[in-house]
Amino acid sequence: MERVDHLADERNKAEFNVDDMKIVWAGSRHAFDVSNRMSRLVANDPVFEKSKRAVMSRKELFKNTLRKSVHAWKLINELRLSDEEGLKLRSFMDQPGFLDLHWGMFVPAIKGQGTEQQQQKWLSLATKMQIIGCYAQTELGHGSNVQGLETTATFDPKTDQFIIHSPTQTSSKWWPGGLGKVSTHAVIYARLITNGKDHGVHGFIVQLRSLDDHSPLPGITVGDIGMKFGNGAYNSMDNGFLMFDHFRIPRDQMLMRLSKVTREGKYVASDVPRQLVYGTMVYVRQSIVSNASTALARAVCIATRYSAVRRQFGSHDGGIETQVINYKTQQNRLFPLLASAYAFRFVGEWLKWLYTDVTKRLEASDFATLPEAHACTAGLKSMTTSATSDGIEECRKLCGGHGYLWCSGLPELFAVYVPACTYEGDNVVLQLQVARFLMKTVSQLGSGKAPSGTTAYMGRAKHLLQCSSGVRNARDWLNPGMVLEAFEARALRMAVTCANNLSKFENQEQGFSELLADLVEAATAHCQLIVVSKFIAKVEGDIEGKGVKKQLKNLCYIYALYLLHKHLGDFLSTNSVTPEQASLANQQLRSLYSQVRPNAVALVDAFDYTDQYLGSVLGRYDGNVYPKLFEEALKDPLNDSVVPDGYREYIRPLIKQRFRSAKL
């Protein structure tokens, strides 16, 4: 049967070359080729089929994840895929599982904190999957406050061993993915105690389960923490708990690149700078920002295609109804999210460069840019994951009632993504780290030390504190210099106001505590400035492809002007813009929506997502939504029979019951 493209008319409206935009989205021709090949490899492999996840029991879902994970590993080896290809294949598998933590946390922890000898021993096993590892830091009682971890590792010089112990219930490791049922080993974090002195939290490699029968080793209590949010979602992952009862490990299983304990029990810091640990943190947070763009793009793709298919109202004579995407209310909610997906993609590209730059500097013992890089990645992780989780939920609502169906793909996507707001750093706590960095930077203004990197704008504090926006008409809001100055003035003035208010407190920590909400807002303003500036830098550079640059410019200014609209209180209260200029920004925003409208479907086609990866009836490439909704409904186990189980037990007795007439 010939496939009908219900979105063909939408695609014919495009004013740019979609294939060229695909290259820009991917980052390069090579990156696109890898992504395209791996996505189609997964889409065409029946083992990776995922439409039945919603009706699986927890045990069935978990076993299904094991099957897919092992199959992915076999493919990587049989096809001799590169690390880049393997990473892409696992991402398109689209099912959280133990491989994510093994490759994403366990292996990098050993690379970053293990000595050369430790890396040779453990990585040779881990990279061949002869051991399976996880990363056990978070405890039941402590997450963000790493220094408050309670698990202890006490050195016993008599046996040359560390005694790992969980002294309280709240000291049990809680949440690590892969821990509950799969991992044979873990990098665990515990308080290092030797000769009665607590040296703080350090990392250790600990075997948890037998390599013969997978049973937990004596002294270890381990299991799954139970069902999480959503139906399938992260319930495919065995997030676990772990308690130690005076469990002994050899001394050489302490990760000793940064510090070590001698045979006699002496604690010795190595000459390797401790700041190297932050390199791994920058890498992890950079990848989280890139993943934010991917997740938001999936939701936006679904909502955009469905908004073009769905028709409601607008017909007064029995004619065809209006496409939902043509309503300005829909555009005002949808197009800023489309712009955000592209914005996060490009700031993610920049963060990859930043990670490479920081790594080179660290290897040369140059730590000058590290505080700024740490604050920047912390803030962008927080900002992008919060915006993405909110954006996915907004896309669900943009799809109306059908967005609530599991087969829309949006409830599952939201349930899988929303933990990003708390893992690898709670988003509010991370913004407070940014705020501390900003307060320090403001305090150094005028000292002769010029701010650099993402805070370079603060070096123009005198101008930015006094300037007025030069916007005179709506088109001025397409001037990159004027847009940037408005965002710079807002960010600087909010930071300076916080610093001035802090100076009124005799106790700085008390002041910081009192001003937490204001500080978070100042940090958010700074991070939004970073994203806007990197988006502008991207679209002002060389971009190949017919019409591509124009479309990206439209999205760039939609992103910036919508942020201005959303946070108008900040811009007005800091006098960064006037009410009249804000009105002109809204006028320009409406014009940009009209320019994006004919290109909307093509702009989400540029993400190059297969129907299998999207996992959405509403977001199908061909737009054939309604027949497929019926097909999905009929697949539900409740429709296996026309009369439901329980009819004779409950329904029939209920409707056949007899009531005696009341006597008057």
UniProtKB/Swiss-Prot annotation:
It comes from Arabidopsis thaliana. Catalyzes the desaturation of acyl-CoAs to 2-trans-enoyl-CoAs. The lineage of its organism: Eukaryota, Viridiplantae, Streptophyta, Embryophyta, Tracheophyta. This is Putative peroxisomal acyl-coenzyme A oxidase 1.2. FAD binds at C399, G400, G401, H402, G403, Y404. Belongs to the acyl-CoA oxidase family. It holds the Pfam family ACOX_C_alpha1. It is an enzyme of class 1 (oxidoreductase). Its cofactor is FAD.
